[in-house]
A protein has these predicted regions:
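ATP-binding N-terminal substructure of ATP-dependent carboxylate-amine bond-forming enzymes
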Residues: 1-126, 138-146
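Active-site neighborhoods of enzyme catalytic cores
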Residues: 154
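A generic structural signal for short coil/turn motifs at secondary-structure boundaries
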Residues: 57-58, 110, 167, 297-299
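ATP-dependent carboxylate activation and anion-phosphoryl transfer catalytic cores
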Residues: 7-26, 48-50, 71-73, 89, ...
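Conserved beta3 strand of the protein kinase N-lobe
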Residues: 133-134
Length: 450
C-alpha cells in the first residue's frame, strides 16, 4: 500500500478519498485554489499545496502544477476523483512519466473508452449489445441526414468526447436535424476541445442503468450489482438508487456478464462503470463507460458492503481486490442517493452560490451524508454546485423511501437555495414510488420545475 497520495480534486470527493486513505493508514496531500483555501478538505489533509487562482483552468486543470505538488511533497500516487482531470489520458500519462501512480485505469483505456464512438465499436466487436448507430464520427450534416433516414427518427446526436449531457441533442423532426447537428458540434467543441459527434437511434422512455465494476492485476473482474440513475435533468443525474427496481435476477445477471465482458475486452484495471439503456421490453444496450469513480458510488457500497475508494487504492498499489471472493454479488437491502445542489428548483434550477448560514444534516439509522461544508461555508460560483450527497439505506425499497422522506425533512440548509425541496416532492410522486421512473420522469412528472 502507498504511504502518501495526492488528491487532485476538491470538495466532497476530495474528502471522501482522504477519509478512505486515512483508514488505510495512508497520508494525504490536498491541492487547492485560492478560492478553496479555507475549505474543510484542505484542513483535513496531512499536507496542502496551493496550485493557482480560483478559475479551474488556472488551478485544478493545470497538470504541471499538480504533478509538481506531488513531487514536492513526496506523494507516490495521485487520485483524480471525478470531474476535472479524472478521465484525461494525458494527465494519466503525465503521472506515469513522473513516476507517479495514477489511481485509475491506463491512459490507453481512458482514451479508448473516452472516445464514445470508438467505445461503441469495441463493445459491438466483443458482443455487448449496442443501440443502432453510425460507424464512427459523422462529419457533415448530409451524412447525419443519410443515417437518420436509414434508421428512422428520432435520433440522438452525441459528442464522441466527454459526457454530462454536453454535445448531446435529440432530433424528432427531420427539419431540425441540421441545426441540432451544428449546435451539438459547437457545444462539444467548446466543452471538450473536440467537436466530433456520432448518431444513434434514440431509445424512447428508457431507464438509465449502470453496472459498477472493479478489475485488478490478478485476473479478478467483478460486477458490484447495478444502479438506476433514471431521474435526470438535461442528462444530469439527480437521484440514484440500487438495486434497480426494474431488474429481476436473470436480467441483473445478464447485465453483469455484459459489463465484465466489456471490462475484459479493453484489459481494464481499477474502478469503472458500464452504463446501459434499458428499454420497455427489457432489452439493454451499451451507452458508455466511465473510467473513474462515480458521484453515486455510495449507493453501491451500501448494498454490497464494499468500500470502492479503498478498493481503488488497493488495486493501484498492486494488491488484489479484497472482496473478489464474494462475487457474484447479490444486493442486500436498498439504497438511494439524493444530490443536494446549490440550485433553485423554483427558478429553473438556477445556480445559487453564497454562504451557508446554517447546515444541519440528518442522522439516525440508515442515513449517510457525504459533504465538505459546514455552517459558514461558502459555495463558490467557480465550481460544481454539489453541496452534499444524502444517502439512505433500508431493508427494502419501501423502508428506503420512508427513510429518505424523514432525512430530507430533517436536512436544514439556510443561506442558499438547494434542491432539498425538489427531492422531497419526488418522494411523494406515485410513479417514482412505484419504481417506474424513466429518463423522461422530470419532464413528464415534474414539468412545473423546468
Amino acid at each position: 500500500m502507498f504511504s502518501k497520495i495526492l488528491v487532485a480534486n476538491r470538495g466532497e470527493v476530495a474528502l471522501r478519498v482522504m477519509r478512505a486513505a486515512k483508514e488505510l493508514g495512508v497520508k494525504t496531500v490536498a491541492v487547492y485554489s485560492t478560492e478553496d483555501a479555507d475549505t474543510y478538505p484542505v484542513r483535513y489533509a496531512d499536507e496542502a499545496v496551493c496550485i493557482g487562482p480560483a478559475q479551474a483552468n488556472q488551478s485544478y486543470l493545470v497538470m504541471s502544477n499538480i504533478i509538481a505538488a506531488a513531487k514536492t511533497t513526496g506523494a507516490e500516487a495521485v487520485h483524480p476523483g471525478y470531474g476535472f482531470l479524472a478521465e484525461n489520458a494525458a494527465f494519466a500519462r503525465a503521472c506515469a512519466d513522473n513516476d507517479l501512480v495514477f489511481i485509475g485505469p491506463s491512459p490507453d483505456c481512458i482514451e479508448r473508452m473516452g472516445d464514445k464512438s470508438m467505445a461503441r465499436e469495441t463493445m459491438k466487436a466483443c458482443g455487448v449489445p449496442t443501440v443502432p448507430g453510425s460507424d464512427g464520427c459523422i462529419d457533415t450534416a448530409s451524412e447525419a441526414k443519410a443515417f437518420a433516414d436509414t434508421v428512422g427518427y428520432p435520433v440522438l446526436i452525441k459528442a464522441t468526447a466527454g459526457g454530462g449531457g454536453k454535445g448531446m441533442r435529440e432530433v424528432h423532426d427531420p427539419t431540425d436535424l441540421e441545426s441540432q447537428y451544428q449546435a451539438a458540434r459547437t457545444e462539444a467543441g467548446a466543452a471538450f476541445g473536440n467537436d466530433g459527434v456520432y448518431l444513434e437511434k434514440l431509445v424512447l422512455r428508457p431507464r438509465h442503468v449502470e453496472v459498477q465494476v472493479l478489475a485488478d492485476d490478478f485476473g479478478n473482474s467483478i460486477a458490484l450489482c447495478e444502479r438506476d440513475c433514471s431521474v435526470q435533468r438535461r442528462h444530469q443525474k439527480l437521484i440514484e438508487e440500487a438495486p434497480s427496481p426494474a431488474l429481476d435476477e436473470e436480467l441483473r445477471r445478464a447485465m453483469g456478464v455484459a459489463a465484465i465482458k466489456a471490462v475484459r475486452a479493453v484489459d481494464y484495471r481499477n474502478a469503472g462503470t458500464i452504463e446501459f439503456l434499458l428499454d420497455e421490453r427489457g432489452h439493454f444496450y451499451f451507452m458508455e463507460m466511465n473510467t473513474r469513480v462515480q458521484v453515486e458510488h455510495p449507493v453501491t457500497e451500501q448494498i454490497t458492503g464494499t468500500d470502492i475508494i479503498k478498493e481503488q487504492l488497493r488495486i493501484a498499489s498492486g494488491e488484489p481486490i479484497s472482496c473478489a471472493s464474494r462475487a457474484p454479488f447479490v444486493p442486500f437491502g436498498h439504497a438511494m442517493e439524493f444530490r443536494i445542489n446549490a440550485e433553485d428548483p423554483a427558478h429553473g434550477f438556477r445556480p445559487c452560490p453564497g454562504t451557508i448560514t446554517k447546515f444541519e444534516p440528518p442522522a439516525g439509522p440508515g442515513v449517510r451524508v457525504e459533504s465538505y461544508v459546514r455552517t459558514g461555508s461558502r459555495i463558490s460560483p467557480y465550481y460544481d454546485s454539489l453541496v452534499a450527497k444524502l444517502v439512505v439505506y433500508g431493508q427494502d425499497r419501501d423502508e428506503a423511501l420512508a427513510r429518505g422522506r424523514r432525512a430530507l425533512d430533517e436536512f436544514v440548509i439556510e443561506g442558499i437555495a438547494t434542491t432539498i425541496s425538489f427531492h422531497r416532492r419526488v418522494l411523494d410522486n406515485a410513479v417514482f414510488c412505484a419504481g417506474e421512473a424513466t429518463t423522461d420522469f422530470i419532464e413528464t412528472q415534474m414539468g412545473d420545475v423546468l
